[in-house]
């Protein structure tokens, strides 16, 4: 029962509607890899229409039905990976998706500012995927943070330029030993810097 209560709290906190939470709990539907694959295929089908409005609507539908973590990890990221690996995929479609995803992330950031929360800065560190950086900002926003984003990833973050601010750094992978050493050094200097993964 405690696990069930925790699941309800997690779903509600992540923004899943009350009706959807009730439906998920009544059905006790467990999302399997096959379920995620069919949802990913739905998104690929909508992408083929090359319609930003249809794509925004589908992402909005998925957002109402799934927690932000699940949406990013099980739908958006796999679809983006498929598009980047598919030699037949037109770069225009991948770029269209990224544009809609950034718009989605920015809307999530704006929505989070309407609620109580703490301010933080998100910095991409030695990473190339700007779109995923914005998705990670949306993920943090769903966890109650008011996130500001440095739009361009930085090779060498300088927390001293942002005194007194809470800083999250994101690399898209586990920190290297050098990055971990720098994180520890910054913390020793009194900066509030966390690795976001």
Which ranges hold each PLM region?
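Residue-level detector of family-conserved "landmark" positions at structurally sensitive sites
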Residues: 19-21, 73, 150, 196
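Generic helix N-cap/helix-start motif at coil->alpha-helix transitions
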Residues: 35-37
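Basic, Lys/Arg-rich alpha-helical nucleic-acid-recognition elements, primarily the DNA-binding modules
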Residues: 1-33
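Helix-enriched interaction subdomains in cytosolic or periplasmic regions
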Residues: 51-106
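Short secondary-structure capping/turn micro-motifs that flank functional sites
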Residues: 27-28, 79, 156-157
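Amphipathic alpha-helical repeat scaffolds
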Residues: 9, 40-48
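C-terminal regulatory/effector modules of DNA-binding transcriptional regulators
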Residues: 103-197
């Amino acid at each position: 029962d405690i696990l069930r209560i925790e699941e309800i709290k997690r779903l509600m906190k992540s923004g899943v509607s009350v009706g959807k939470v009730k439906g998920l709990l009544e059905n006790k539907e467990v999302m399997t890899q096959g379920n995620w694959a069919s949802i990913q295929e739905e998104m690929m089908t909508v992408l083929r229409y090359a319609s930003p409005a249809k794509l925004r609507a589908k992402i909005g539908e998925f957002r109402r039905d799934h927690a932000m973590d699940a949406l990013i990890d099980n739908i958006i990221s796999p679809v983006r990976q498929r598009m980047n690996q598919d030699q037949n995929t037109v770069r225009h479609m991948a770029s269209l998706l990224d544009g809609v995803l950034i718009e989605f992330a920015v809307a999530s950031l704006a929505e989070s500012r309407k609620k109580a929360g703490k301010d933080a800065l998100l910095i991409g560190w030695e990473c190339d995927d700007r779109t995923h950086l914005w998705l990670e900002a949306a993920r943090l926003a769903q966890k109650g943070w008011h996130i500001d984003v440095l739009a361009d990833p930085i090779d060498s973050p300088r927390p001293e330029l942002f005194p007194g601010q809470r800083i999250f750094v994101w690399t898209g992978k586990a920190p290297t030993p050098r990055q971990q050493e720098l994180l520890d050094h910054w913390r020793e200097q009194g900066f509030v810097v966390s690795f976001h993964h």
